[in-house]
Amino acid sequence: MNHSDTLSLSLELLEQPSVTPIDHTCQTIMADRLAKVGFHIEPMRFGDVDNLWARRGTEGPVFCFAGHTDVVPTGRLDAWNSDPFAPEIRDGKLYGRGSADMKTALAAMVVASERFVAKHPNHKGSIAFLITSDEEGPAVNGTVKVIETLEKRNEKITWCLVGEPSSTHKLGDIVKNGRRGSLNAVLKVQGKQGHVAYPHLARNPIHEASPALAELCQTVWDNGNEYFPATSFQISNIHAGTGATNVIPGALEVTFNFRYSTEVTAEQLKQRVHEILDKHGLQYEIVWNLSGLPFLTPVGELVNAAQTAILNVTGTETELSTSGGTSDGRFIAPTGAQVLELGVLNATIHQINEHVDVHDLDPLTDIYEQILENLLA
């Protein structure tokens, strides 16, 4: 079987067991290809994380492909139908950890850039790659650090295409033009431990906190807008008690998360939570962690370029969406860049037997190349 350029490079990347935060030479494989077509290669290592900044051209505007080489752990190997790091094609599907999220998109980006540069050696502006091995992990030494470095030297990205698997039913049907913000909290409610037979000598933090938690669950934080659904509050963990059946616990710990829209700020959410907890007279402490601000790329040059390319290649009228979890786009958007996420189908990401349709790889490459044509030719 003759493999296309994109499929061949995908197979090479998928053979690398790059479980986060280990890159396992994926970035070197990409950098070697890019260097041959005139990209300046700049590895950036922070802590135990490999990052790659590659750029062809010195002028603006700057079109940047962004993505990650790290993958999530495989889970039980005996549950896979084949070795997750020995990619296999079966029934038109390419199986392997990272096939959907997101090594095939990385391959498509490289091949699209090679083809575009061959046709337009003196293209407008610059093409860049921002690749990290710390997207699936804590995301502390990855894209955010590269962006900080670029900002310090006033190197700006105009348009950024993140290759996350955005498609739902067919290639290109969904493009993510924004993401909700994510705000986490750990709430500790203090009570007084005691014997269940003598409740008057104790204070049960579960009983005291329950009305407040119920109110938090029932609160309408906002109504969303045309791009974002309403803000969602979800409790993920509750822990209290010693395990004994005759002891009133002395403390309660609750972990919760907000996925929030551009209609509200993290500070407003924090303030409203404190007001509810205070109203119920709780003795508490709370630790907040903001893991991502919401961002939105309105219809403009990048959205138009992507929608046109998808329509030309696949015949699909794409839909803009802000659904799903956070991505590294949250670190790039605050610089003022227009950010879009466009990649293969996301139905099997992070799952056992993760796979992608082989027949989507060349059209994805064509879409990426056409976006470059639309913006930099």
Curated annotation (Swiss-Prot):
Binding annotation for Zn(2+) 1: 68, 101, 164
Q: Which UniProt keywords apply?
A: Amino-acid biosynthesis, Cobalt, Diaminopimelate biosynthesis, Hydrolase, Lysine biosynthesis, Metal-binding, Zinc
- Which cofactors? Zn(2+); Co(2+)
* Catalytic reaction(s) noted: N-succinyl-(2S,6S)-2,6-diaminopimelate + H2O = (2S,6S)-2,6-diaminopimelate + succinate
Q: Where is the active site?
A: 70, 135
Q: What is its EC number?
A: 3.5.1.18
Record keyword Amino-acid biosynthesis present? yes
Note the Pfam families from the entry.
M20_dimer (PF07687), Peptidase_M20 (PF01546)
According to the UniProt entry, the coiled-coil residues are none
Residues at which Zn(2+) 2 binds:
101, 136, 350
- Co-factor binding comment: Binds 2 Zn(2+) or Co(2+) ions per subunit.
Q: What class of enzyme is it?
A: hydrolase
Q: Which GO terms describe its biological process?
A: diaminopimelate biosynthetic process; L-arginine biosynthetic process; lysine biosynthetic process via diaminopimelate
Its pathway is:
Amino-acid biosynthesis; L-lysine biosynthesis via DAP pathway; LL-2,6-diaminopimelate from (S)-tetrahydrodipicolinate (succinylase route): step 3/3
Please name the InterPro entries in this protein's record.
Answer: Bact_exopeptidase_dim_dom (IPR036264), DapE_proteobac (IPR005941), Peptidase_M20 (IPR002933), Peptidase_M20_dimer (IPR011650), Peptidase_M20A (IPR050072)
Which superkingdom heads the taxonomic lineage of this protein's source?
Bacteria
Picking any one GO molecular function of the record gives: cobalt ion binding
Function of the protein? Catalyzes the hydrolysis of N-succinyl-L,L-diaminopimelic acid (SDAP), forming succinate and LL-2,6-diaminopimelate (DAP), an intermediate involved in the bacterial biosynthesis of lysine and meso-diaminopimelic acid, an essential component of bacterial cell walls.
Subunit structure, briefly? Answer: Homodimer.
Family listed: Belongs to the peptidase M20A family. DapE subfamily.
Descriptive protein name:
Succinyl-diaminopimelate desuccinylase
Organism in which the protein naturally occurs: Acinetobacter baumannii (strain AYE)
